[in-house]
Design a protein with these regions (language model features):
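Anionic-ligand binding patches
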Residues: 2-10, 16-34, 38-213
Length: 213
C-alpha cells in the first residue's frame, strides 16, 4: 500500500501520546513519520472553533516550515451534558479555570464540571488532515468518533489525556485499561486514519499515476 502513498511526512504535533500512537499506526505501512519538533517547528496556533479548521491550520503550518507533506490531528473529548465541552479546548481545558495545562488538571476540571449531572455520555472525536504541500487546495480530511462515558474514578495506566476516565461500557474498561494494540484497533484516531488511508488510496487510483490528483 505504501508504494502508492506519501512515504515521508511531517507530523504536526508535539504530543508524546499522539506521536506514539501515530508511529504504531503508520509503521506497518512503511511511512516515515518525522515529528515537527525534530525539525524545530513550533506548534501552530489553534484559534478556530472546530476540529477541522484547527487541523487544516496545523497541517499547512507544518508543511510550510518543513517543505514536506504534513499530517495534522485535532482531537478531543466532547461531553453531552456540557454541550460538547471540552471539545477543541481539551488539551487546555483546565487553563480556563486558571489551572495548569496537564492531563491531571484537565481530568479533574472535567469531573468537576460534570458533578451532579446524570448524563455522562461522551465521545472522543478526531479529525486528520493531510496536505501534500502548504497551498494544497484539496487537503484530504478524515474523521473518527469513539463513544463512551465519563467516570469519576480513574482506571488504568495506559493511554494519555482523558483515557483513565473514558469508560467503554461494551468492554467494561476505560481507554487507559486497553493495551496499545487494542486501543489502536478501535480508537477515534485509528478510525480516522483508516478512513484517511482509504481516501488517499482512492485518490491515487483515480489519478492513475500512483499519486493523488
Amino acid at each position: 500500500m505504501a508504494d502508492i502513498m506519501i512515504q515521508r511526512l511531517v507530523l504536526a504535533s508535539n504530543n508524546p501520546g499522539k506521536l506514539r500512537e501515530f508511529g504504531a499506526l503508520l509503521a506497518p505501512l512503511g511511512i516515515e513519520v518525522v515529528p515537527q519538533g525534530d525539525l524545530g517547528i513550533p506548534e501552530a496556533e489553534e484559534p478556530h472553533p472546530t476540529f477541522v479548521e484547527n487541523a487544516i491550520a496545523k497541517a499547512r503550518h507544518a508543511s510550510r516550515l518543513s517543505g514536506l507533506p504534513a499530517l495534522a490531528d485535532d482531537s478531543g473529548i466532547c461531553a453531552e451534558a456540557l454541550d460538547g465541552e471540552p471539545g477543541v479546548c481539551s488539551a487546555r481545558y483546565a487553563q480556563k479555570a486558571g489551572k495548569p495545562k496537564t492531563d491531571a488538571a484537565n481530568n479533574a476540571h472535567l469531573i468537576s464540571q460534570l458533578a451532579g449531572k446524570l448524563n455522562r455520555r461522551a465521545h472522543y472525536h478526531c479529525v486528520l488532515v493531510l496536505v501534500r504541500h502548504p497551498a494544497d487546495p484539496c487537503p484530504l480530511i478524515a474523521e473518527g468518533t469513539w463513544t463512551g462515558e465519563v467516570v469519576d474514578a480513574p482506571r488504568g495506566a495506559g493511554g494519555f489525556g482523558y483515557d483513565p476516565h473514558f469508560m467503554l461500557p461494551r468492554l467494561g474498561k476505560t481507554a487507559a485499561e486497553l493495551s496499545a494494540e487494542e486501543k489502536n484497533a478501535i480508537s477515534h484516531r485509528a478510525l480516522a486514519l483508516k478512513e484517511l488511508l482509504a481516501r488517499l488510496q482512492a485518490a491515487a487510483s483515480n489519478n492513475g499515476n500512483g499519486r493523488p490528483a
